[in-house]
Amino acid sequence: MHNLEMLPDMIRAAKEMGSPIIIQTSIDTAKYIGYNVIVAVVKELANSMLVDVALHLDHAKDFDAIKDAIDAGYSSVMFDGSSLPFKENIEKTRLVVEFAHARGVSVEGELGTIGGTEEGVSVSEEDKEYTRPADAVTFVRETGVDVLAVGIGTNHGQFKSKTNVKIPLLKEIHSVVDVPLVIHGGTGVKEED
């Protein structure tokens, strides 16, 4: 979500569908509106409409933003250490998991990179890193993440060309880890994928 005006319709749609909903904010949106304001509005709407809502902070690269979100009442955070060396990504993600889990908050980690531009960070097609299944096993085991975002060829942002999503790679990763997988960057993904 990018503004408070979106929230009532999002939660109302979930109610009409009889479904829980995950509402995700970027760090920029959360800082602009205020973590506490977002949490208060989401809680009020969720309680008044009787809808289960998970409030998720997306692509946090520093611990302070994660702490701010958790302290305000977010129920889920993503630590994006995908640009870090593998071992450093594991170490920093593990610290986030320890902090978050002690407060009942779930954590998404990222392994591999997503192409395109988001939050001012650009990754070219040539620089995309695909998630290796063996690394995914190690990462999940050593960090304790609840969900894992994987690099399988998708892109953030608006693209005119189609992306080349590696579905066999996704299936292989899925077969070797025991946590749900998250795919970021659906822009340009072929309808059949």
Please describe what each predicted stretch is.
Residues 2-28, 36-52, 60-183, 189-193:
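Alpha/beta enzyme core
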Residues 32:
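Cofactor-binding active-site loop characterized by glycine-rich and histidine/acidic residues
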